[in-house]
Amino acid sequence: MKLQNTLILIGCLFLMGAMIGDAYSRCQLQGFNCVVRSYGLPTIPCCRGLTCRSYFPGSTYGRCQRY
């Protein structure tokens, strides 16, 4: 019984890691933090259909939201 629980836990962690890794490697999902002005630094863009809206006017950081 203990082995089965351990395998389930490992499976869940692997899936979560894959999902998080996928989100960070390609694009930011809705509600995730993003950078409005990168100043030439490498940043992760928002996913297709989303735009980076700043928290307040002039802010460098924002959150990915639908157009």
Curated annotation (Swiss-Prot):
GO molecular function: potassium channel regulator activity; toxin activity
Keyword terms, alphabetized: Antibiotic, Antimicrobial, Disulfide bond, Fungicide, Ion channel impairing toxin, Knottin, Potassium channel impairing toxin, Secreted, Signal, Toxin, Voltage-gated potassium channel impairing toxin
Distribution of this protein across tissues and organs: Granular hemocytes, small secretory granules.
Pfam family, one: Tachystatin_A
GO biological process: defense response to bacterium; defense response to fungus; killing of cells of another organism
A GO CC term assigned to this protein in UniProt: extracellular region
Site note May be important for binding to chitin, residues: F32
Annotated localization: Secreted
Predominant place of localization: secreted
InterPro entries per record: Antimicrobial_tachystatin_A (IPR022717)
Superkingdom of origin: Eukaryota
Protein's UniProt keywords contain Mitochondrion: no
Cysteines engaged in disulfide bonds, as pairs: C27-C47, C34-C52, C46-C64
Signal peptide per UniProt: 1-23
Described purpose of this protein according to its UniProt entry: Exhibits stronger antimicrobial activity against the Gram-positive bacteria (S.aureus (IC(50)=4.2 ug/ml)) and fungi (C.albicans (IC(50)=3.0 ug/ml) and P.pastoris (IC(50)=0.5 ug/ml)) than Gram-negative bacteria (E.coli (IC(50)=25 ug/ml)). Binds to chitin (8.4 uM are required to obtain 50% of binding). Does not cause hemolysis on sheep erythrocytes. Has no blocking activity on the P-type calcium channel. Has also been shown to weakly inhibit Kv1.2/KCNA2 voltage-gated potassium channels and TRPV1 receptors.
Domain notes: The presence of a 'disulfide through disulfide knot' structurally defines this protein as a knottin.
Protein name in the entry: Tachystatin-A2
Organism: Tachypleus tridentatus (Japanese horseshoe crab)
